[in-house]
UniProtKB/Swiss-Prot annotation:
TM region(s), chain numbering: none
Protein known as: Uncharacterized protein y4jR
Disulfide pattern: none
Keywords annotated in UniProt: Phosphoprotein, Plasmid, Two-component regulatory system
Organism: Sinorhizobium fredii (strain NBRC 101917 / NGR234)
GO terms classed as biological process: phosphorelay signal transduction system
Stored Gene3D superfamilies: 3.40.50.2300
Modified residues (4-aspartylphosphate): 53
Superkingdom, natural source: Bacteria
Domain Response regulatory: 2-133
Amino acid sequence: MKTLIVEDNPKKRASLVEYYSSEFPSDDLEVTSALISGLRVARDTKPEFIILDMTLPNYSPDENKGSRIELMPFAGREFVMRVNRMSIKTKVIIVSMFETFGVAPRLITLNSLDAELRDRYPNVFVEAVHYSQAQADWKTAIKNARLSLDR
């Protein structure tokens, strides 16, 4: 199965890749670190499963040409919307280190975001889960989402 991981934090990215590769060693895994490169890879390779961070830069450092890297708090929402528009037959799970996004008065929780994306994009979006090295909830969520694609 083709899988795409879009994550900009090197330690979290390594953790996601290590876990996913150990659970699903026969899957074809692509990894990117920014919104635009992730969308390009999704368009070109049509992955069946996408593990996505919520807060991402628009461009990766090598694409940014020396400009300041600005994080977009709702990049994951944008990604899901665009993948849905591209009609890619995929399932997306968001794995985020943050539990709130944006700034007041537009602050939104991970749970609210999860409900919004499930409602708006039921054919693409699976769930949003909190990432923590100390807890295994994110591992269980990834494993369950991936295994559901085999049914």
